[in-house]
């Protein structure tokens, strides 16, 4: 059993999603958004750090998964996003959580089946996969999709390792 915290970073809205994985079964534990309503960036970063730290304390995750920075058209926005990611990662590292990073296209490919999926498609598939009553907020859905991607990637890695081990055992006999 593992608890995974997914983070969709943003300097104004940071989405989070927490799921439990037991084998191939995923269970929704919680999700939401950290909203920073102050104008100055240092204060927003402080709120993101405090919010992520509080979520980690509340849910006690085993793994921390976060979206990688993508190249934005606006350099200033990309820098702010990078700083928001940074404080979220520091919150995880300060609580000794292993950090995993996933590209947005990989997350969409894993959850929806296409790397160019729309936010509404991600919301729908997250709702379906986690058997939720309603679509989560867009940023929370993205964070849950990041957590689901981590489960999928680690599950596939374990299966590949087991297959290699079985092959090696077969050769040794």
Swiss-Prot record:
Protein name: Crossover junction endodeoxyribonuclease RuvC
Tagged with keyword DNA-binding: yes
Subcellular localization, as worded in the UniProt entry: Cytoplasm
Top class in the EC scheme: hydrolase
Enzyme active site: 8, 67, 139
Matching PANTHER family: CROSSOVER JUNCTION ENDODEOXYRIBONUCLEASE RUVC (PTHR30194:SF3)
First-listed, main subcellular location of the protein, grouped into a coarse class: cytoplasm
Record has Transferase as a keyword: no
Superkingdom assignment: Bacteria
One GO process term, biological-process aspect: DNA recombination
Species of origin: Enterobacter sp. (strain 638)
GO molecular function: crossover junction DNA endonuclease activity; DNA binding; magnesium ion binding
